[in-house]
Amino acid sequence: MALLPDKEKLLRNFLRCANWEEKYLYIIELGQRLTELRDEDRSPQNSIQGCQSQVWIVMRQNAHGIIELQGDSDAAIVKGLIAVVFILYDQMTPQDIVSFDVRPWFEKMALTQHLTPSRSQGLEAMIRAIRAKAAALS
């Protein structure tokens, strides 16, 4: 995730955007920075149900117990939202992910009130899936 900013820089960059068009473009740019997902990882077990777009999220635990996330979507804005979620969960253990509430970060960014209801539901589905996978590993 070296190409993605940390949580604090994400928030600073997001708040520097002059309007929501710039914020959407920034989210899309973050999605473009994600590591390419391998074709074999675009499988049903990595598919996230509850998203209008196709979304795949792969979770692996490294030798130090830290979760590594990879993901992709067929929609640019959704891929950017995946990147935002990954930034928030960066360098966490499964236990950290289960106990960490991303919603205050979304509130600071005023993110959810500017998403369509289906995108908000998809974002919630991604978070639920990541937390469930983390709970299974903890």
Curated annotation (Swiss-Prot):
<keyword id="KW-0963">Cytoplasm</keyword>
<comment type="similarity">
    <text>Belongs to the SufE family.</text>
</comment>
<dbReference type="GO" id="GO:0005737">
    <property type="term" value="C:cytoplasm"/>
</dbReference>
<comment type="pathway">
    <text>Cofactor biosynthesis; iron-sulfur cluster biosynthesis.</text>
</comment>
<dbReference type="InterPro" id="IPR023939">
    <property type="entry name" value="Cysteine_desulfuration_SufE"/>
</dbReference>
<dbReference type="GO" id="GO:0016226">
    <property type="term" value="P:iron-sulfur cluster assembly"/>
</dbReference>
<dbReference type="InterPro" id="IPR003808">
    <property type="entry name" value="Fe-S_metab-assoc_dom"/>
</dbReference>
<dbReference type="Pfam" id="PF02657">
    <property type="entry name" value="SufE"/>
</dbReference>
<feature type="active site" description="Cysteine persulfide intermediate">
    <location>
        <position position="51"/>
    </location>
</feature>
<comment type="subunit">
    <text>Homodimer. Interacts with SufS.</text>
</comment>
<comment type="function">
    <text>Participates in cysteine desulfuration mediated by SufS. Cysteine desulfuration mobilizes sulfur from L-cysteine to yield L-alanine and constitutes an essential step in sulfur metabolism for biosynthesis of a variety of sulfur-containing biomolecules. Functions as a sulfur acceptor for SufS, by mediating the direct transfer of the sulfur atom from the S-sulfanylcysteine of SufS, an intermediate product of cysteine desulfuration process.</text>
</comment>
<protein>
    <recommendedName>
        <fullName>Cysteine desulfuration protein SufE</fullName>
    </recommendedName>
</protein>
<dbReference type="GO" id="GO:0006790">
    <property type="term" value="P:sulfur compound metabolic process"/>
</dbReference>
